């Protein structure tokens, strides 16, 4: 995973997850991480999928900005022949609207099984071509003008594999005028792990296990990146982020993701929508965009 992978994981979790509450008495840091990982799981009877509109606004400094609007499709599929902790595959399709990127599509297939890598494709309408992003060079391209790469989006990973976690403290933080009780976790990179950062702090909300804030530091103790949920909303009774802001201090880029019109489709999505060979036929208007 590259530099913004952990912050990107939180962003994607905010986009695609329906969360569940869990009793918190006497909980350990590793148990909190397990619950955070479970945010990416959905019930096996949830076969409808989710639609949303996502706007990515990037501020590069010196009055230089960019903005992209994407139509988001998400569907989790299940393989009952596999173990319960490896039976899900999350399919995400992002359709670019407007500007030079009109009609471009990014498709990602992310297995729940940590031993299996995500697969990614990019559809280029001008060429009528779908390209799988396999090499590091392919995956290093900027996603929607941000400091996140395509590879970052495909790197959800397991925090427990790369970091030793402790509960640093408990406190309350404010998000959009409301106060939330959180655990502040300190994640220290394991000596033999290929971790992006030496130290990560996460502010995890105690009821829904949302990562409301994250700070990532290098081995010199310098803050390299941070992420925060700026505005929270509700979807089917659960709290979800509506505005997420990330800062890459190395590149001086501030990216703001706004999620709107989060909804179920009128007709359940099917896995055919996420077929790499059929991306050129996708019509967002058919899904209410």
Whereabouts are the PLM-identified features?
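Edge/loop elements at the starts and ends of beta-strands within beta-rich repeat scaffolds
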Residues: 40-48, 85-87, 236-238
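Functional cores of ribonucleases/endoribonucleases
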Residues: 74-112
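Extended lipid/amphipathic-ligand handling interfaces
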Residues: 37, 70-82, 228-234
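Gly/Pro-enriched, hydrophobic low-complexity segments
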Residues: 97, 119-123, 129-135, 140-156, ...
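N-terminal, post-signal-peptide region of Sec/Tat-exported proteins
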Residues: 50-81
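Bacterial N-terminal signal peptides
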Residues: 10-20
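Flexible, processing/modification-adjacent segments and terminal tails
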Residues: 25-46, 53, 60-62, 110-198, ...
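Bacterial N-terminal signal peptides that target proteins for export
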Residues: 2-12
């Amino acid at each position: 995973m590259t530099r913004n992978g952990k912050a990107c994981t939180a962003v994607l979790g905010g986009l695609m997850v329906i969360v569940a509450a869990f009793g918190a008495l006497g909980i350990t840091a590793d148990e909190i991480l397990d619950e955070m990982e479970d945010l990416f799981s959905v019930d096996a009877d949830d076969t409808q999928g989710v639609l949303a509109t996502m706007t990515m606004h990037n501020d590069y400094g010196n009055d230089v900005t960019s903005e992209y609007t994407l139509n988001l499709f998400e569907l989790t599929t299940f393989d009952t022949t596999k173990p319960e902790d490896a039976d899900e595959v999350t399919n995400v399709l992002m359709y670019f609207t407007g500007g030079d990127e009109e009609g471009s599509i990014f498709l990602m297939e992310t297995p729940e099984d940590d031993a299996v890598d995500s697969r990614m494709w990019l559809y280029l309408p001008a060429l009528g071509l779908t390209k799988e992003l396999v090499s590091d060079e392919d995956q290093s391209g900027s996603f929607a003008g941000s400091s996140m790469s395509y590879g970052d989006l495909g790197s959800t990973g397991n925090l427990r594999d790369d970091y030793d976690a402790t509960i640093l403290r408990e406190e309350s933080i404010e998000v959009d005028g409301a106060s939330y009780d959180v655990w502040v976790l300190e994640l220290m990179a394991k000596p033999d792990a290929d971790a992006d950062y030496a130290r990560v702090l996460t502010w995890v909300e105690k009821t829904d296990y949302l990562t409301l804030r994250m700070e990532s530091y290098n081995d010199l103790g310098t803050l390299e990146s941070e992420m925060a949920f700026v505005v929270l909303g509700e979807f089917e009774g659960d709290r979800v982020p509506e505005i997420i802001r990330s800062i890459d201090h190395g590149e001086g880029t501030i990216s703001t993701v706004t999620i709107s019109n989060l909804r179920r489709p009128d007709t359940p999505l099917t896995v055919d929508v996420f077929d790499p060979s059929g991306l050129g036929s996708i019509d967002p208007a058919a899904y209410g965009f």
